[in-house]
């Protein structure tokens, strides 16, 4: 792309890049902006079909992200489908004021399914966090191990690799530590 300029209606665009998608793009609202300011960013599948899917419900997004056979430009990339586990103990380092964390829920999703708001429930209250960057930061931790599509793992990141996530509650152990 050296020496090339992307334009929309004759004007240079503000271009955003990422190494790997989840198979579906999003609009400019992912950065907290009004999507109409970046009409060239569209929430469509990342393939030749450019199909628009409604991934704004947790059920629809989870079904999409669990599909290992999604047809996408980068579906063979190592981070196309990744997963990790975290615990209430790890999350307590960044989230205070709710007691022992017992639940995490994505309460709203943006175009393409990115996590827009996160509700954290604890034994002494709850908090809601907004913005995919903030959510990625809150849930990320350098100690997490990311299982990649290629069978290898990655570590050392203090934020989640993407805001295109779903969360499963995997239960609480005898020490009252909840795993997600």
Per-region residue spans from a language model:
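Conserved, single-site charged/polar hotspot
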Residues: 1-180
């Amino acid at each position: 792309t050296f020496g090339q300029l992307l334009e929309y209606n004759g004007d240079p665009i503000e271009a955003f890049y990422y190494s790997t998608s989840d198979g579906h793009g999003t609009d400019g609202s992912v950065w907290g902006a009004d999507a109409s300011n970046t009409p060239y960013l569209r929430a469509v599948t990342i393939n030749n079909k450019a199909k628009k899917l409604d991934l704004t419900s947790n059920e629809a997004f989870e079904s999409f992200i669990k599909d290992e056979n999604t047809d996408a430009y980068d579906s063979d990339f190592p981070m196309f489908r990744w997963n990790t586990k975290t615990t209430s103990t790890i999350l307590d380092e960044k989230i205070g004021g709710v007691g022992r964390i017992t639940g995490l829920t994505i309460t709203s999703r943006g175009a393409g399914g990115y996590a827009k708001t996160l509700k954290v429930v604890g034994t002494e209250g709850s908090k809601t966090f907004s913005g995919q960057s903030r959510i990625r930061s809150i849930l990320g931790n350098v100690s997490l191990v990311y299982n990649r599509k290629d069978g290898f793992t990655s570590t050392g990141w203090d934020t989640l690799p993407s805001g295109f996530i779903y969360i499963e509650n995997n239960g609480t152990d005898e020490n009252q530590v909840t795993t997600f």
